[in-house]
Each structure stands twice: as structure tokens, then as C-alpha cells.
């Protein structure tokens, strides 16, 4: 690792100007980086150490960089070469070469540098002083010249104006005299003596005025001429001063040259040598410190070697762990793949089973619904036909109980609909009428009772129609039935005016139908006003009071136990048909929402009619007759015989058929229960499979988390590896920068040479401009009073003492500059970037020049004051 060779790959480090590189095992320095006209892309111009190149820094007549002339003239041949970045390699010198830079060579280079710096500083200060003096003299010359020219031009203008005015006045006087002569000659014989005297007086006054103005103009002209003469004299004096000042300037230049020679002679004195020896001691101490740092760096290199070995061992172990983890991960992935395949297969089977079970479940639901419908119908028929069992033949009491049963069935179902309320109340009314007819058949009154019964059974209450509608659960409109009931009651006055029948019909209407009708109107209508709500509440309360009154009238104590009967007063014309027409027409069968309020008002009228009816009811005692008792006994005997003869066979057959149907239904229900149990078992199996799948997913997630943790550990180890590599590279870079600081010193010297050439060229241009202005010999006055006060250099001894004092101060400044300069102290323990070096170097150099300029001004002022 300590031989000359490549330090780092060029792709990892940026190549810049003045870097030492290798091109095909040839050492050289980078002098150009950029695009060229002979080929595309970025090319690197290299100045080789040996004449093994292909050109002298130019190609196709275009120069891209310069080669050292001494090298080219002494050895001959070409030192230039153009190449790409890929062929370049950084050059790292051997430790043997580095060890040759011992203390003696460093001291010699330091002495040479200090001598060059002092000479450059003295020359530069001298040139700066000359430059400043010449600039000030040029500025003063230019200002005085402009002032004088402006004054002369102003005076010339005044003289010209006065001459013009004088000529105008003369011409004006001549013209005036001619006019006077002409007027005198023309008007002399005509005018009187008085007028002539007046005119003469006027002309005399005008003449006096013109003389006064002429005298004033002449005085002004004389003053201007005097001023002009004075200015000309001043101009002559100034021109003499300029010539004298030119001679003084030459003398000052000579004195400045003598001073520069004396400063150069004194710069080689012992003080500067002592300071240089001190600087040499400092440099040796710095070199020792650098050697100590090199030893520390070598120890660090050994540590880095040990770290690298441990890192390689760790890397091998981690790679083994990685391979093991990858194999385990692949196995787990295979297991997860099998689990996923099994999961997908189970999902497919589950979906097929669910589809089948859903289809079977739907079919079973249909069967269950049909069976429930059939069971409902069978129960309805069973209960319906059980009503006939106590009777031997069809009986009105049985019909009443059948209608009552159907009313209870419709009440147990959805009673919120208006149609159900309608059917319920009609069935209640028909049941009450059939029971009343049954009572009348027992009493065998009136005469035409048979036709009335036949009409009621066939037209009013056809039980077969009601039974078929209940079995199919499809009910037709019953408005015609309601009106036919009212018509039937009107035709049969004994029923229409039967108070007991009226009360028995009104009781269920007021107890169940009216509250549900009010609730229906309240919920299914948009009644938001308080008046309507109060009306519904009052109607409900009135229905409750009416029910209480009806209960009192038809109570067991008043009717059944005592031989009393209810009658209406003859003046009362209220009948059952009139009450039912009010109820059926407007209150119950009104289906328009906007007419609900009118239906409530009709209900109020209905309640008023019931109240008036109840007020007209009276109770009278009734004498029992022998005929009625005989007829009742005969009817009972007939009924018993008839029921025993007809119903026995028919009921037996019906019971047998119903039992068979029930057995079939029970078998079907058992089959359905077994199928449902099978479906439940399959559902449990499906749930267990889903739970297994969930557990497998949880295990997979845990494995994935473990893999993520292992990958994070691997990433951390990779980062540590990367950081160690970067540290090693940084250490190598530091070593390279410590060994490459000599090249930076050379760059600094080149930059100083360039600055010196620029300053010299600027000063030469200023000298040429001053000489050109002196040759033109313009008449300008320059104030060089400060040069008149310069002392003559006759007393050599005090002047030399002061020069020695100034040289001491200059030596102190040089020591400070050398101690702060980057040439002596490059801070080798802290590697700097090249841009930073250029910036700090320029900054320190500029600050040094400013300090020197200021000190030279102070010295010149001190010299002048000393000799005053």
C-alpha cells in the first residue's frame, strides 16, 4: 500500500486542475479541462514530466494550455497530451520520496520564498507610491486646466460683447448726428429761435446721456482689459510653475529610486536574517509535529486494518446468517404458498357449498312457506268446522260463531290497514245479526222468518265466499256488502229496531273499531294542527264513555238475570240501518287523505246519534207465556235430532281426512328439520375452516414481521459497512492531502507572479498617460506645494537612522505576514478543499497589500515631518 500507484478510482473522486495524475504509467499534471474543437466531449490536457507527449498544448492551431518554456527549451520534444477521464489515475508518491523532503530542503525553500516575498513587497510598495503620486498629480492638472480654460473663455466672451456694444453706440451716434444736420438744414429757415433753443437743449441732454453711457462702457472695457492682462500674467506664472514642477517631479523620481536602492540594501541586513532563522525554527517544529501526526496516522491505519479484518469476519458471519434466513424464508414461502392454495381450494369449495346451500335453503324456504300456508289453511278449516260439531245440522248460532271466529282471525293479523278494519266490523255486524236471527227462530217470530233467513244466508252472509277469501288471503271490496246489510235491515224492521241487537253491534264497534280507526287517521294523515288532534282525543274519550253506558244497559244484572227488556221511546226514529249507513258511508270507507277531517266530523255525528239513541232507551218487564216456552222446547228437540242425524257421518270423514293431512305435514316437517340440521353442521364445518384459515394468516403475518426485522438488521449492518468504508477512504484522502500540499504552495507562487505582472502592466500604463500629458504642455497650474516641502537628502546620518527604524517595522510586518501566511502554516492536520485554499490565499494577499500601502504612506509622512 505504500508504493506509488493509484489512490482511489477516478469515478469516486473529482479530478481538478494542477492535480498529479498517471496516464499509461506516465506521470504528469492536469493543465486543461473542457471541450475542444478536434473532438466532442470533455478532454483533459496533461503536461508530462518527460518528453513523451504528442503536442505542446495546442491542437489544430488552437492552444489550450501552456508548457514550461525552460523544460521545452532544455530537453526538446513534446510534453503535452490530451486524453479522457477514464484513462487518468491519481498519482500517490512513495514514502521514500516523501522522506527526502528533510529539514535542509525545507529551510532552503523557505529562505528563497522569504527573499522573493521581501523583494516583491518592496518593489510593490514603491510602485504603489509612484502610482498614487502620479494619479494625484494627473487629477490636479486636469482640474486646474479646466478651471483656467473656463475663466479664459468667459473673459473672451465679455470682451467681444463690449466691443460689439461700443461699435453699436458709435454707429448710433453717427446716425443721430447726420439726422441733426439734415433737420437743421431743412428746418432752419422755417423755425423760430425759441424752438431751436428748445431743441438744442434737448439734444444737449441726449448728448450728455450718451457721453455718460460711453464713459461707463469705456470704464468697463478698461476693467476687463486689466483683468485680461492679470489673467495672462497668472497664466504665465502657472506655466512657469508647471515647468518647475516637472523638474521637481524628475528630482523626486530620482530620490525615490535612491530610496528604493537603500531599502533593498537594508533589506539584506541582519534583522531579517534573524527573523528568517526564527521562522526556520518554527518550520522545523512544524515538521516534527507533522511527523508525530504521521506516526499517529500510521497507528490509525493499523487500527483500520484490524477493523477491516473484523469487518470482513462480521460480513462473512452475516452472509451466513443471511443465507440461512433466505433459505428459511423460502421454506416459509413454500409453506405459505401451499396454505394459500389450500385456502383458495377451500374458498372455492365453500363458495360452491354456499351456492348449493343457498339454493336448497331458498327451495326449503318456499316449501316451508307453502307448508305454513297449508297449515294455516288447515288450522283455519279445522277450527272453522269444529264449530259445527255440537250441532247436528247447519245452525244460525254456528254461523254466528264462524263469523265471530273469522273476525278474530282478521283482528290477529295486520290490523293497521283500513281494509282489515272494514272486514272486521262487517264480520262483527253479520255475527250479531245471525245470532239475533237465531234467537228469533227460537221464538218463531215473525211469520216470514224463513225467507229472511234464506236471504241472509245466501245474499248477505255467504260463508263459502268468506272462507275462500280467508284461505287465499285475497279480500275484495266490501262496500257493497255493507250497503246490502243496511238494505237488509231496512227491509226487516224487527231487526232494524231491535235495541238489544243495536247495543251488541255498537259495543264492539266502539270498543275496538273506533279506537283503531282513530289511530289510523292519526298516523296516516298529516294532521299538524292542535284542533284536529283535540278532536281525535275527544272522540276517543266519548267512545269510552259510550262503551261504559252500553255495558250498563246490557249487563247481566239487567238483561239476563231479570225478566226485563230494552225498548225505545216511540218518538225516537233512530234505527240500526241509519247508524250503520253513517258509519259505512263516510267514516269507514273514505280513502282520500284530504277528506279525513270530514270523516272525523261524520264520526262526531255518529257519536251524537248513539248518544241520542242511548238517551231514548228504556227498560220494561216482560211476562213469559206458555206458548213461547212450548215453542222453545219443540225447537230444542228438533235441533237435537237434526244435528245427530246429519253431522255424524260428515264430521267423521272430515276428521279422518284432516288426520291424514296432519300426519303428512308432520312427516314433511321432520324432513325439513333433518335437512336444516345437516345445513347447520355444514355451516359449522365452514366456520372451523375459516378459523383455520385465519390462524394460518396470523402465522404468515408473524413470519413476515420476523423477515422484516431480519431485513432491517441486514440494512443496519450494510450501513455500518458503508460507514467503515467511507472512514477508510477519508483517512486515505487525508494522507494524500498532507502529501500533496507542496503542489498547493506552487499554485500560490504562480498566482503571486500573475498578480505582480498585472500590477506592473497597470503602473506602466499610468506612466505612459502621464508622459503623454506632460508632452502636450497644456497651460495648467498644478498645486505641488507638498513637493516644495520635501527635504534635501544631505544629512545622511539621521535619514539612515529613520530608514533603519522603518525597516524594523517592515521586518515585524513581514514576520507577521509570514507567520499568518498559508505558505508556512498550511494546517496539514486539517485537509482543505482547493477552492477554499484559493479563496483564503487571495484574501490574505489582498489584506497584506492594503497594510503595506497604508504603512508606506505613514512612512513617507514620517520622513517629511522628521526633516521639518
Swiss-Prot record:
SUPFAM superfamilies named among the record's database cross-references: Cap-Gly domain
Primary location: cytoplasm
Gene Ontology MF terms in the entry: microtubule binding
Record-annotated membrane-spanning stretches: none
Domain CAP-Gly: 34-84
Coiled coil: 101-175, 207-375, 645-776
Biological processes per GO annotation: actin filament-based movement; establishment of mitotic spindle orientation; nuclear migration involved in conjugation with cellular fusion
InterPro entries: CAP-Gly_dom_sf, CAP-Gly_domain
GO cellular component labels: actin cytoskeleton; cell tip; cytoplasm; dynactin complex; dynein complex; microtubule; microtubule associated complex; spindle
Keywords: Coiled coil, Cytoplasm, Cytoskeleton, Dynein, Microtubule
Subcellular compartments: Cytoplasm; Cytoplasm, Cytoskeleton; Cytoplasm, Cytoskeleton, Spindle pole
Known function: Motor-binding component of the dynactin complex which assists cytoplasmic dynein by increasing its processivity and by regulation of its cargo binding. The dynactin complex is required for the spindle translocation late in anaphase and is involved in a cell wall synthesis checkpoint.
Subunit structure: Component of the dynactin complex composed of at least ARP1, JNM1, NIP100 and ARP10. Dynactin comprises a short rod of the ARP1 filament attached to ARP10 at its pointed-end and probably associated with the capping protein at its barbed-end. The rod is implicated in dynein cargo binding. A sidearm formed by NIP100 projects from the ARP1 filament and is implicated in motor binding.
Miscellaneous field: Present with 238 molecules/cell in log phase SD medium.
Protein name: Protein NIP100
Natural source organism: Saccharomyces cerevisiae (strain ATCC 204508 / S288c)
Amino acid at each position: 500500500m505504500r508504493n506509488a500507484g493509484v489512490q482511489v478510482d477516478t469515478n469516486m473522486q473529482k479530478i481538478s486542475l494542477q492535480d498529479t495524475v498517471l496516464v499509461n504509467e506516465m506521470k504528469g499534471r492536469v493543465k486543461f479541462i473542457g471541450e475542444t474543437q478536434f473532438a466532442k466531449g470533455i478532454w483533459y490536457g496533461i503536461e508530462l514530466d518527460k518528453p513523451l507527449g504528442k503536442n505542446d498544448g495546442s491542437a489544430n492551431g488552437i492552444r489550450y494550455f501552456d508548457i514550461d518554456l525552460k523544460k521545452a527549451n532544455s530537453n526538446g520534444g513534446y510534453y503535452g497530451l490530451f486524453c479522457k477521464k477514464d484513462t487518468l489515475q491519481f498519482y500517490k508518491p512513495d514514502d521514500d520520496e516523501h522522506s527526502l523532503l528533510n529539514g535542509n530542503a525545507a529551510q532552503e525553500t523557505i529562505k528563497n520564498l522569504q527573499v522573493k516575498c521581501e523583494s516583491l513587497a518592496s518593489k510593490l510598495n514603491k510602485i504603489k507610491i509612484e502610482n498614487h503620486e502620479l494619479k494625484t498629480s494627473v487629477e490636479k492638472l486636469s482640474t486646474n486646466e479646466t478651471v483656467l480654460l473656463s475663466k479664459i473663455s468667459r473673459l473672451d466672451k465679455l470682451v467681444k460683447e463690449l466691443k460689439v456694444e461700443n461699435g453699436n453706440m458709435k454707429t448710433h451716434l453717427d446716425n443721430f448726428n447726420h439726422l441733426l444736420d439734415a433737420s437743421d438744414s431743412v428746418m432752419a429757415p422755417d423755425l423760430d429761435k425759441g424752438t431751436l433753443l428748445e431743441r438744442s437743449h434737448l439734444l444737449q441732454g441726449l448728448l450728455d446721456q450718451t457721453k455718460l453711457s460711453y464713459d461707463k462702457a469705456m470704464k468697463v472695457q478698461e476693467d476687463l482689459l486689466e483683468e485680461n492682462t492679470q489673467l495672462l500674467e497668472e497664466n504665465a506664472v502657472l506655466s512657469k510653475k508647471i515647468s518647475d514642477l516637472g523638474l521637481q517631479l524628475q528630482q523626486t523620481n530620482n530620490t525615490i529610486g535612491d530610496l528604493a536602492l537603500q531599502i533593498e540594501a537594508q533589506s539584506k541586513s541582519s534583522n531579517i536574517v534573524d527573523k528568517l532563522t526564527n521562522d526556520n525554527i518554527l518550520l522545523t517544529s512544524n515538521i516534527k509535529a507533522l511527523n508525530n501526526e504521521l506516526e499517529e496516522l500510521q497507528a490509525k491505519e493499523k487500527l483500520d486494518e484490524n477493523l477491516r479484518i473484523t469487518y470482513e469476519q462480521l460480513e462473512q458471519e452475516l452472509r451466513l446468517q443471511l443465507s440461512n434466513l433466505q433459505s428459511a424464508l423460502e421454506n416459509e414461502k413454500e409453506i405459505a404458498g401451499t396454505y394459500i392454495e389450500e385456502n383458495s381450494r377451500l374458498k372455492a369449495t365453500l363458495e360452491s357449498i354456499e351456492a348449493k346451500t343457498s339454493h336448497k335453503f331458498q327451495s326449503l324456504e318456499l316449501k316451508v312457506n307453502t307448508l305454513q300456508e297449508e297449515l294455516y289453511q288447515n288450522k283455519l278449516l279445522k277450527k272453522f268446522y269444529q264449530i259445527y260439531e255440537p250441532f247436528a245440522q247447519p245452525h244460525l248460532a254456528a254461523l254466528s260463531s264462524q263469523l265471530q271466529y273469522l273476525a278474530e282471525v282478521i283482528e290477529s293479523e295486520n290490523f293497521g290497514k283500513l281494509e282489515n278494519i272494514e272486514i272486521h266490523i262487517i264480520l262483527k255486524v253479520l255475527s250479531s245479526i245471525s245470532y239475533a236471527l237465531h234467537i228469533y227462530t227460537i221464538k218463531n217470530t215473525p211469520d216470514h222468518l224463513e225467507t229472511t233467513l234464506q236471504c241472509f244466508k245466501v245474499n248477505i252472509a255467504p260463508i263459502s265466499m268468506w272462507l275462500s277469501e280467508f284461505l287465499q288471503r285475497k279480500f275484495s271490496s266490501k262496500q257493497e256488502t255493507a250497503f246490502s246489510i243496511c238494505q237488509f235491515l231496512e227491509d226487516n224492521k224487527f231487526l232494524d229496531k231491535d235495541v238489544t241487537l243495536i247495543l251488541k253491534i255498537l259495543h264492539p264497534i266502539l270498543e275496538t273499531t273506533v279506537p283503531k280507526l282513530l289511530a289510523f287517521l292519526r298516523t296516516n294523515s298529516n294532521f299538524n294542527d292542535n284542533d284536529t288532534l283535540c278532536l281525535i282525543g275527544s272522540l276517543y274519550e266519548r267512545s269510552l264513555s259510550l262503551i261504559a253506558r252500553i255495558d250498563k244497559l246490557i249487563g247481566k244484572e239487567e238483561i239476563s238475570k231479570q225478566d226485563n227488556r230494552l225498548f225505545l221511546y216511540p218518538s225516537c226514529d233512530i234505527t240500526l240501518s241509519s247508524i250503520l249507513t253513517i258509519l259505512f258511508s263516510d267514516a269507514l270507507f273514505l280513502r282520500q287523505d284530504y277528506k279525513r277531517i270530514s270523516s272525523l266530523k261524520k264520526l262526531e255525528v255518529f257519536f251524537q246519534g248513539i248518544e241520542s239513541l242511548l238517551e231514548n232507551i228504556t227498560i220494561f218487564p216482560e211476562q213469559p207465556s206458555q206458548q213461547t216456552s212450548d215453542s222453545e222446547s219443540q225447537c230444542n228437540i228438533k235441533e237435537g235430532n237434526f244435528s245427530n242425524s246429519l253431522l255424524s257421518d260428515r264430521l267423521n270423514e272430515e276428521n279422518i281426512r284432516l288426520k291424514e293431512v296432519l300426519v303428512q305435514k308432520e312427516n314433511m316437517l321432520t324432513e325439513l328439520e333433518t335437512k336444516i340440521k345437516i345445513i347447520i353442521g355444514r355451516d359449522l364445518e365452514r366456520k372451523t375452516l375459516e378459523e383455520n384459515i385465519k390462524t394460518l394468516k396470523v402465522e404468515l403475518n408473524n413470519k413476515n414481521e420476523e423477515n422484516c426485522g431480519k431485513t432491517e438488521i441486514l440494512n443496519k449492518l450494510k450501513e455500518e459497512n458503508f460507514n467503515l468504508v467511507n472512514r477508510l477512504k477519508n483517512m486515505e484522502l487525508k494522507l494524500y492531502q498532507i502529501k500533496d500540499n507542496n503542489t498547493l504552495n506552487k499554485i500560490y507562487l504562480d498566482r503571486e507572479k500573475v498578480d505582480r505582472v498585472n500590477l506592473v502592466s497597470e503602473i506602466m500604463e499610468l506612466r505612459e498617460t502621464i508622459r503623454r500629458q506632460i508632452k502636450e504642455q497644456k497651460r495648467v497650474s498644478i498645486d505641488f506645494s507638498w513637493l516644495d516641502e520635501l527635504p534635501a537628502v544631505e544629512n545622511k546620518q539621521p535619514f539612515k537612522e529613520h530608514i533603519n527604524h522603518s525597516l524594523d517595522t517592515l521586518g515585524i510586518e513581514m514576520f507577521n505576514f509570514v507567520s499568518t501566511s498559508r505558505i508556512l502554516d498550511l494546517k496539514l492536520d486539517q485537509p482543505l478543499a482547493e477552492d477554499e485554499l484559493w479563496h483564503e490565499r487571495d484574501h490574505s494577499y489582498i489584506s497584506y497589500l492594503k497594510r503595506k500601502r497604508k504603512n508606506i504612506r505613514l512612512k513617507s509622512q514620517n520622513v517629511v515631518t522628521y526633516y521639518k
